[in-house]
Amino acid sequence: MAFDPASLTYDARGLVPAIAQDHATGEVLMMAWMNAEAVARTLETGRVTYWSRSRQSFWVKGETSGHIQRLVELRIDCDRDCLLLLIEQVGPACHTHRRSCFYTAVREGAEQVFLDPMG
């Protein structure tokens, strides 16, 4: 059965959350938003394209930084309202130059940063 991005369940803004995960290690790298066109562009090019809510424009991950995300596999959750992008990440995924955007943990009631920026 052919996949149609319109078959996903989008929110009122026409967006669906997309979680980027390293395909080899399983590490969760980031979460961003996609609309139907971003999903289609990602599938067509193999380069992950998100929708920037602040800029109201497409955002090809790594287009300016060189820290690209290559799509290995796109997975859809059971409600069709969230995507899991299995990717190959080149360089850091986070704009803070960390491998993952999830670099702060709450441990024993206190926030603790456990990932340093990549050199």
From Swiss-Prot:
InterPro entries: PRA-CH, PRib_AMP_CycHydrolase_dom, PRib_AMP_CycHydrolase_sf. Its cofactor is Mg(2+); Zn(2+). GO terms for molecular function: magnesium ion binding; phosphoribosyl-AMP cyclohydrolase activity; zinc ion binding. Mg(2+) binds at D77, D79, D81. SUPFAM superfamilies: HisI-like (SSF141734). One of its GO terms (cellular component) is cytoplasm. It catalyses: 1-(5-phospho-beta-D-ribosyl)-5'-AMP + H2O = 1-(5-phospho-beta-D-ribosyl)-5-[(5-phospho-beta-D-ribosylamino)methylideneamino]imidazole-4-carboxamide. Catalyzes the hydrolysis of the adenine ring of phosphoribosyl-AMP. This is Phosphoribosyl-AMP cyclohydrolase. The lineage of its organism: Bacteria, Pseudomonadati, Pseudomonadota, Alphaproteobacteria, Rhodobacterales.
